[in-house]
Amino acid sequence: MSQKNETTILILALAITLGLLFTGFWLFNGVINRQKDQPIPPFTGSLEERISLGNKILVNADRNPNKEAGVTAFAKVDFPTAIAQLESSLKKKRNDPEAWIYFNNAKAAENNPLKIGVSVPIGGNLNIAKEILRGVAQAQDEVNNNGGINGMPLQVEIANDDNDPSIVKKIADKWVKNTKILAVVGHNTSDASLAGAPIYQQGNLVMISPTSNAKKLSGIGSYIFRTIPSISSEAEVLARYALKTNRLSKLAICADSQAKASQSFKEEFIAKFDNEGGEISQIACDFSEPNFNASAVISQAVSDGAEGLVLAASVDKIKRSLDIIIANKGRLSLMANSTLYTIDTLKFGQSEALGMVLAAPWHPEAIPDNPFPKNARKYWGGDVNWRSALAYDATQAIIAGLK
């Protein structure tokens, strides 16, 4: 097939596919609007050091001798050696998504592959980056083991954007200029996606974010998609739970004034909660406040008569949400958006996080007989979370669009 001149067909297919992939939220204990490109500010470090098809390791935490030998061979275009070494690496650490992607890229290299990109915050939040990569890696492996896309295997180029908007713009610009990149899975935070989306839109390159749900992303253009449901849906489900199930009539809310998704969630939650007859405490709680004091926030909320506290967490300020959880000591009922669904919440919140209610766009037990969770356990040795599932959906949507 031709390369980017097939994008219109891809967009039509994606529009249909993404409509089928909507997952909803669960609680548990055609005209292109071209925009001018924004200036791309400089950043420290070489862009080439941040992008790899298999010629360099980006996730330094997962280095081992076989993986290093594999990427060295890949860089020398010695694909048989790369395949053998990366396969040996995966036998030692099967749940390494970067190694899976490079392994499949090496196998696809000499078979007229189709290429996409995935951009994740390896240097910003490694756990989240690997969660997204797992979904992409699984979708790539499955399609390549089943004949590829019209007989052509899929390659995935990985970029590390650190969730830094200035770096995102550089990566987006590079991929738009690379006619072999047919679509992009990314980015993670809404601020990152909002930085890259106008560049992809102007360059007619499809971008699908599995995790960005800020309201502003929806209006950028017809090449911009996401697999995560709207932030309004997330806020509505949590607000209804607080009032109807948990019977909390007055809540305090913490958000990050510097993160668009966090602010979007706060605005939507307040509107939904107010419409249902609830009351929002007027205490100030901003995760970006330089002198943020979690204990003071809890004390002020209790003094103001709040019965619960909603955490509109942001990826860059997750630690401050965890500080709130630890400082709470069970005094307020805690609820949070899907951003706080991370391993760090369990690791650092521990017993203080018990009873907290999270909104999530996907859960392995939410859809009976869904084959994805079972297959994911075989790949990764345990359950995956919503970021992996929606990254898998994003990649599957691109695959469907390219067929």
Where are these regions (language model features)?
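Beta-alpha junction/loop-to-helix N-cap segments that form part of ligand/metal-binding clefts
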Residues: 77, 93-113, 127-131, 149-216, ...
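Short beta-strand segments enriched in small/hydrophobic residues
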Residues: 110-135, 140, 251-256
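Periplasmic-binding protein-like
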Residues: 118, 175-190, 207-210, 250-256, ...
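Short beta-strand elements at the ligand-binding edges of bilobed clamshell
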Residues: 128, 206, 215-240, 350-363
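An alpha-beta-alpha
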Residues: 140-141, 222-287, 307-308, 398, ...
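Extracellular/periplasmic periplasmic-binding protein-like sensory domains
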Residues: 325-393
